[in-house]
Amino acid sequence: MKIKEIQTEIVDEFSMFEDWMQRYEFMIDLGKTLPLIDEQFKTDDNIIKGCQSKVWVHAELVEDKLVFTADSDAIITKGIIAILIRVFSNQKPAAIIEANTDFIDEIGLKEHLSPTRANGLVSMIKQLKLYAVAYQTQLN
């Protein structure tokens, strides 16, 4: 599935909920489905800087596609990174680099996060795209 298709699917899923309490519960549930990072990768090198909570992300290239695993010590943050990994994992680095993240505004996520969590969201997106740039360089 292409990035835009996954983003549209997420927007559709979020539109099923009437209020933000239900959406937060949905994000918490998504966090429970997150492909968890192996304990050996829970290092300072893999912590996303700029997040209030601890968020670890590991990336590896599998058949020219990036596969992400992650974890967080906070349930909402775990849900946020789960959404991002759902969008970007198993995609080619070039597609990740080129992808926009307008779907985040469409679901209203940024406006319903505290300023520190919103900054963390931006940091997560930035880090996933930096991984894509690094791996794209290796492919070239």
Positions of PLM-derived features:
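Short, local alpha-helical segments
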Residues: 65-67, 83
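A short interface-forming secondary-structure element
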Residues: 72-74
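Short Cys/His-based metal-binding microdomains
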Residues: 77-79
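Alpha-helical support elements that line or immediately flank enzyme active sites
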Residues: 81-91
